[in-house]
Amino acid sequence: MALDPAVKQQIIKEYATHEGDTGSPEVQIAVLSRRIKDLTEHLKEHKHDHHTRRGLMGLVGRRRRMLGYLQNVDIERYRALIERLGLRK
């Protein structure tokens, strides 16, 4: 399930660190988080869709690795991002 381009652009605009920023860890993690949320909702309805579940696990792993990278590079940006996204209760 692809993310709607308008929604993706809105997320990019919201989390970008500068004009034209699409590759910063903050933007990538925010986009992944939205895709993870959408797939989680899909799996609540379609419990036996194991192909999607496997894709979801890949996205969760990718987000976890990016969060680890951001934590090692700049702990303040990491803390601000997890606060904004509502991760890590």
UniProtKB/Swiss-Prot annotation:
Which residues are the signal sequence here? none
One Gene Ontology molecular-function label: structural constituent of ribosome
Q: Which SUPFAM superfamilies match?
A: S15/NS1 RNA-binding domain
**SMART domains given in the database record:** Ribosomal_S15 (SM01387)
Q: Which GO terms describe its biological process?
A: translation
What superkingdom does the record give?
Bacteria
GO CC, any one term: cytosolic small ribosomal subunit
Tell me the keywords, alphabetical order: Ribonucleoprotein, Ribosomal protein, RNA-binding, rRNA-binding
> Does the keyword field hold RNA-binding?
yes
The keyword Disulfide bond is assigned to this record: no
Which Gene3D superfamilies does the entry mention?
6.10.250.3130, S15/NS1, RNA-binding
Q: What does it do?
A: One of the primary rRNA binding proteins, it binds directly to 16S rRNA where it helps nucleate assembly of the platform of the 30S subunit by binding and bridging several RNA helices of the 16S rRNA.
Q: Which family does it belong to?
A: Belongs to the universal ribosomal protein uS15 family.
On assembly, the entry states:
Part of the 30S ribosomal subunit. Forms a bridge to the 50S subunit in the 70S ribosome, contacting the 23S rRNA.
Name assigned to this protein: Small ribosomal subunit protein uS15
